Amino acid sequence: MDSIINALTSNNFQRTNTPISKPLVVHAVAGAGKTTLIQNLLPEHPNLAAQTAGSPQTPNLTGAFIRKLTCPESNKINLLDEYAALQPLKGSWDVVLADPLQHPGLALRPHFIKSVSHRLCPATTRLISKLVCPCTSSRTEESTIQFSGLFEGPLLGTVIALDQTTQALLTAHGAHFLCPTAALGLEFDTVTVVSALPLEEVADKVGLYISLSRHRSQLHVRSPPPHPSH
């Protein structure tokens, strides 16, 4: 367990005032590196076993990879990624990790948190901070972020429809789209988010957060004004 806590500290996860208990709870925003941290720990520590309630890694020859969720392994320190997808959490896990902003259920009180994203650009984290929850970016380069009215711009890249109104509209026009839950865990170079409401009026903060954090290079938003500053 010391190796895990040392890795969290060295990767700038911040200790909270919650007393250490089992399971050790780690929360991080999208792109903060929690899954990468697990990936880096596994080859060096054969006493660790990692599973995920999200998308498992491809198996490799070493056996050091994040597996699909089954149950904790005996005689191992067991880590569970994306635990917040499970309601309720079951099993005797030693460490559980998640971005709780991507799931609607109640999360556990964390022992470590990280609100700095290495994938999302500063403009994106400012936008998410304004609309959902405070976070920052370690990047210096900006992505392209562009807003226009619902019918005033093209649908570029992967389209994410935030609500039933826009989903029905896109379906009627034969346009392919994802709902926020289908986009969970995925990344795309270019994303267009479509909303029937101004983003500041969207009540589904989980869906909004997922939608605004899927792009790598370009984010386009098609929604009624006013459009948030970023």
Swiss-Prot record:
Q: Where is the (+)RNA virus helicase C-terminal domain?
A: 115-230
For biological process, the GO terms are: symbiont-mediated suppression of host innate immune response; transport of virus in host, cell to cell
**What InterPro entries does the annotation carry?**
(+)RNA_virus_helicase_core_dom
**Compartments, record wording:** Host cytoplasm
Keywords attached to this Swiss-Prot or TrEMBL record, sorted alphabetically, are: Host cytoplasm, Host-virus interaction, Inhibition of host innate immune response by virus, RNA-binding, Suppressor of RNA silencing, Transport, Viral immunoevasion, Viral movement protein
Tell me which GO cellular component terms the UniProt record holds: host cell cytoplasm
Drop me one GO molecular function for this one.
ATP binding
Q: Which domain of life is it from?
A: Viruses
Other notes: TGBp1, TGBp2 and TGBp3 seem to act together for cell-to-cell propagation. TGBp1 is the main movement protein that physically cross the plasmodesma with the viral genome. TGBp2 and TGBp3 would facilitate TGBp1 function.
What quaternary structure, including any partners, is listed in this protein's UniProt entry? Homodimer and homooligomer. Interacts with capsid protein. Interacts with host AGO1; this interaction targets the host protein for degradation, thereby suppressing the antiviral RNA silencing.
Q: What does this protein do?
A: Transports viral genome to neighboring plant cells directly through plasmosdesmata, without any budding. The movement protein allows efficient cell to cell propagation, by bypassing the host cell wall barrier. Increases plasmodesma size exclusion limit. Acts as a suppressor of RNA-mediated gene silencing, also known as post-transcriptional gene silencing (PTGS), a mechanism of plant viral defense that limits the accumulation of viral RNAs.
Q: Which family does the record claim for this protein? A: Belongs to the Tymovirales TGBp1 protein family.
Protein's UniProt name: Movement and silencing protein TGBp1
